[in-house]
């Protein structure tokens, strides 16, 4: 693989795994408060990266969910996106305009917003209730980092929904 470095790759995966306890705490707090549905929102690559989580929820859960392109979410203004919704999105740079606009719109309707970013100090986090940062991530290893954290989020929502009996 071009540009592959064991050390960097391991750092990225370790940081993503290290975020899981904080992810679990955030999801537990959201579930305790109550929510109606999940929105998986992205732009370009981060939209594509949410596809496996979308499939996991579709095939293994009764949680109501939506899988949306960020710009379309803002344009369509779905009626199901409310103060009782949870929006999950990601942007390595935190400067993707469409993703920022989607998070801003979600906050305007009162939704809870979870974001995954490379750096906490970025425009996207202005509209986030929960921020999970991975400073070691880059475009070369973003997929693995996002997958780990997306699956941690999805699994915890599903666990709290009673879908993992053990």
Predicted regions and their residues:
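Active-site phosphate/pyrophosphate-binding segments
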Residues: 2-36, 138-142, 153-166
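Glycine-rich phosphate-binding loops that contact phosphosugars or nucleotide phosphates
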Residues: 36-165
């Amino acid at each position: 693989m071009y540009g592959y470095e064991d050390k960097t790759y391991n750092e990225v995966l370790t940081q993503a795994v290290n975020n899981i306890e904080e992810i679990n705490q955030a999801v537990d707090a959201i579930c305790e408060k109550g929510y109606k549905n999940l929105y998986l929102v992205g732009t370009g690559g981060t939209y594509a990266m949410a596809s496996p989580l979308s499939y996991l929820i579709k095939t293994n859960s009764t949680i109501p969910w939506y899988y949306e392109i960020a710009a379309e979410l803002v344009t369509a203004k779905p009626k199901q996106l409310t103060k009782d919704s949870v929006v999950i999105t990601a942007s390595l740079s935190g400067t993707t305009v469409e993703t920022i606009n989607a998070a801003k719109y979600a906050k305007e309707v009162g939704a809870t917003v979870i974001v995954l970013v490379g750096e906490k100090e970025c425009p996207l986090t202005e509209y986030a209730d929960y921020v999970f940062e991975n400073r070691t991530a880059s475009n070369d290893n973003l997929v693995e980092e996002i997958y780990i954290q997306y699956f941690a989020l999805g699994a915890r929502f599903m666990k709290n929904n009673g879908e993992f009996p053990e």
